[in-house]
Amino acid sequence: LTGIVLTLADTPGKDHPSATELEPGLWAPYHQHILCARMDLDIDGTNNSVVEVESFAHPIGEKNPYGGAYETRETILASEKKAQRLIDPIKSRFWKIINPNKNNHVGHSVGYKLIPGHTTFPLALEGSVLGKRAGFMYQHLWVTPNQDHERYPAGDYPFQHDGGAGLPEWTAADRPTENTDVVMWYVFGTNHIPRTEDWPVMPVE
């Protein structure tokens, strides 16, 4: 993040629970930056699948005698609704896009790994104007069959519709996403609670 924060003016010292006073009488509102990366990946060909990987530990016993071992569980996200996912750092959740028809030198499907980094979840309520028009932001991962006209996660004209366009509308059909030409949509962002140090020009972070 960098740049110049949006500001509003009011009586110095007035209480604004959703803003930071930067100078006497000058506030910067709290806000979020939420982005979506459309990733059309062709891993050794166009027929790909997306796999969710989670880590877990067995109770102490035959499979985990000292309590320090853990395993992974893989789930193919075979349809659009199954592929609407949130991050879960407790399970070290990540996603792979693989080509199930091509193997590497040890016999596993070739692929790439998407590791979620620092991100946030929208604080705008789903029933708000923003929540309706940017419904894509309520999942961290979406997977769709590749369609050239499906370009923007909030639809082509988010300011000209009442809500529901883009990813929520397209994925309502629950199209298959296994072993086909797929697009991964990764949603990420951050909360920006302005500081006095952000004024007049933000540092780079």
For each of these PLM feature ranges, what is it?
Residues 1-205:
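Extended effector regions of multi-domain proteins
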